[in-house]
Amino acid sequence: MRKTILTLWFTLCLLLPSFAATPIDGLLERIDKGASKKFIIEQKKSDIDFFELDQRGKKVVVRGNNYVNIAAGINWYLKYYAGIHLSWNCMEAKLPAVLPPVTQKERHETTLSLRYDFNYCTFSYTMAFWDWERWEQEIDWMALHGINMPLAAVGYECVWKNIMERLGYSKKDIDDFIAGPAFLAWWEMNNLEGWGGPNPDSWYSQQEALQKKILKRMKEYGIKPVLPGYSGMVPSKFLVQQAEVSNNIESSESSISTVQLWNGFTRPGILMPTDPRFQQFSDMFYEESIRLFGKADYYSMDPFHEASNIPAGLDLDACFKAINAAMKKANPKAKWVCQGWNENPREEMLRAIEPGDVIFLDLFSECRPMWGAPSIWQKDKGYADHDWCFCLLENFGANIGLHGRMDQLIDNFYLTKNYPQAQHLIGMGLTMEGSETNPIMYELMCELPWRDEKFTKEEWVKGYVKARYGADDEKVQEAWQILAREIYNCPPSNNQQGPHESIFCSRPSLDCFQASSWSKMSNYYDPTTTADAARLMVSVADKFKGNNNFEYDLVDILRQAIADQARIVYNQTVADFKSFDKKRYKSDYKEFLRLLLLQDKLLKTRSEFRVGRWTEQAKQRGTTQAEKDLYEWNARVQITTWGNRYCANTGKLRDYAHKEWEGILKDFYYPRWAKYWSVLEEQIDGKAPVLPVGNSSWARYCQDNPALTIDWYAMEEPWTLDHTPYGAEGEGDLVETAKEVFKEAFGK
């Protein structure tokens, strides 16, 4: 008996540390095994968010008023004392045996108590196929960056599936309504239905389980998720389907929006909040959401988002009140989180909702703020008396490219303090359409709430670079100052959405500029400066070999330099064609194609820049070959045609989510450009009809010119249906490849 008791006691002693462990212990252990023993973590009550760095003997003390702020303090210490930068490209590090001491206590406070993360688009453009391992890293990243209020939209297709089954909808009806994995974001935003599906049952069970894990970890950290709410979405065939199923919801055409298109896709219907059936639907939605995922303090709803199908004479005040009332019925303490985007929020919403019941996300604060700073979306009264968050959008379509508005971001952030609306500024947010790019911009944004005094980008970049690489180097600093001054400093006069898009990813023409339809791109930096920065990085690459952050940045900066050089060569090639300079034309277009293949070769060295990482993530979520094929098709379509022929061409969605990645460069973009240049070559050689560029008979020119009648979609679709596997991990000697590629691209 005594032996049994001793054994039980010994077992409990072994298990006790895991029972007593805090989420901070788990975070530190995931960063580096044994790291939790190197810190003293102290939680102190405070009415204001803060973290402190201190020293006690040989151990570093990190103090804060909650786990998230303590994690933010750990991140600050790692960057500015230990020279360790945890980033999307590297969330693990080897800490020194003895941590560098904090010689003087350092304290940071913020009045921005809410720090938001994500855009609905992020859940499809970046996170569509993430598993728990990747989500665990992201939640750690959020905590380290002070995020305490993220959108948590995983698994909401499960809520809708259950609602429709309760209402008696058939499996086909459900499949026709709910979108596939790579397109769920736009279904949730009421833009399309069914595209990318049907989802197998295993998808729903996986997503439900994944969301529950995500929410559990967030709760451990004290992170409060923003869950999707209900604002009236119903299937576009709602009236017909309601007549076919057995339920007590009456049909009335007057309160259903007319069927509209979104870039060629049929939008779901909108059950107007003034309709009595709205309450029945919203009740079911919140019941099912709470049953699956629990009650939330915040719900995200964007009624009439990019919508033109609002019935004339609709009482918008009543609509907004009904949406808010439905949420409050589910949780009287809940707050509505709404995006400030385009025409939203409408004046009727500002008037209808009581201050304190809604939080607006100023989605594009660094470029198009609504709170008073000069912009095309400026509102004289901002968000009136409502609370709001200053947000960084930064990325569209998860496109690849160096980009930022450093001066504008810093200026706009500190400018808010001088506006009357600042009294209602309660938070900040990251609202990118796609993540895992330009880590420097998100690091800057997440530090702003913790820095009282305004600073210059030059001084901040100097500290960032030293922290990111764990060492100071004159040439590396010079490279980053060039980038900060040029490509990372898009000016206020420029209204473009996201990075300077790679010419490689454009559908070929004689007037290519941007790859996607709506980027509003315009030149704002000297394109030769990225090569200058790349040259400096390459010159010290041997010194930093094996440094994960440096190697990622080396590839990214050189990638940008090659893309910029290719644009210069493209312009030369077009000029050659227009002047019928056969010799130079052939030489220049071959140089363009050579640069494209060099880019493909370079990007093969890093997993983050390989299309196989994306397609393999998709396939790994499948439990059968049919599921793997469906998910791979979703992944391939999203980054190329986006939709069917009509949506890609007439709807202009093609290449919106283009990716400058290894694999797709060689197998998708190269054939497009090779085809185009060869057609022009036939014209310049007199083997095909051509009319002078700028001929007055433009209609005839378009009809007769084979370069303008290429069926691009017919070339593109086969790649989306293909199943040729791509490698997901980086291959080869990165530093040697970078040096070789730079020499081949720039000749010195």
Label each region the model flagged.
Residues 7-17:
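Bacterial N-terminal signal peptides
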Residues 112-131, 142:
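Active-site-adjacent substrate/metal-binding segments within catalytic domains
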Residues 19-112:
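Contiguous, structured surface segment used for ligand recognition
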